[in-house]
A protein has these predicted regions:
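Short, structured active-site "lid" loops
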Residues: 52-70, 74
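Mid-chain, well-packed structural core segment of small domains
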Residues: 70-112, 116
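Short active-site oxyanion
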Residues: 2-3, 65-68, 87-89
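A short beta-strand-loop structural module common to alpha/beta enzyme folds
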Residues: 33-46
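Short, glycine-/small-residue-rich phosphate/pyrophosphate-handling segment
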Residues: 96-142
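Charged helix-capping and loop-helix junction motifs
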Residues: 51-54, 93-95
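Conserved small/polar residues in nucleotide/adenosyl-binding loops
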Residues: 148-150
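N-terminal beta1-alpha1 ligand-phosphate binding loop
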Residues: 2-21
Length: 150
């Protein structure tokens, strides 16, 4: 599984925590930790979130990565940017329940979180839940296909 992660300045510190936890999780599963690609930002210096949101969404849409993670102050801006890219189903999740539902029912391919909304501990649990949850298919498949054709 290849994952690409990006953030703006508000999400930088939580991104670092999530990245470390996911790399450790991938290594426990005997997966290559280099399958987690960080595209920035790389500091607390102010940046424009659309640049990073679009890059992550483009990677996922092109198949360069299977999934993405985007973190900004609220998660709202990143989710808006990502969902403008064809083929992206970005979900703004603030807890493990919404992360689980985003995967099970909506086959979300990008997880968005708000660094001013969740703690680093919550963000790690949300990300782990997102990546450990499979799409249920069935009746949800029809709904996701309908969404794709809008």
């Amino acid at each position: 599984m290849k994952i690409v992660i990006g953030c703006d300045h508000a999400g930088y510190e939580i991104k670092q925590s999530v990245k470390l936890a996911l790399r450790a999780s991938l290594m426990k599963k005997d997966e290559d930790a280099t399958h987690l690609q960080d595209i920035g930002c790389d500091s607390l210096d102010s940046v424009h979130y659309p640049e990073y949101g679009k890059t992550v969404a483009d990677w996922v849409a092109a198949g360069t990565a299977h999934y993405g993670i985007l973190i900004c102050g609220t998660g709202i801006g990143m989710s808006m940017v990502a969902n403008k890219v064809k083929g992206i189903r970005a979900a703004l999740c603030h807890d493990v329940y919404t992360a689980m539902m985003a995967r099970q029912h909506n086959n979300a391919n990008i997880l968005c979180m708000g660094a001013r909304v969740v703690t680093p501990y919550q963000a790690i649990n949300i990300a782990n839940t997102f990546f450990e949850t499979d799409f249920l298919g069935g009746r949800h498949e029809v709904r996701v296909l309908s969404l794709i054709h809008i």
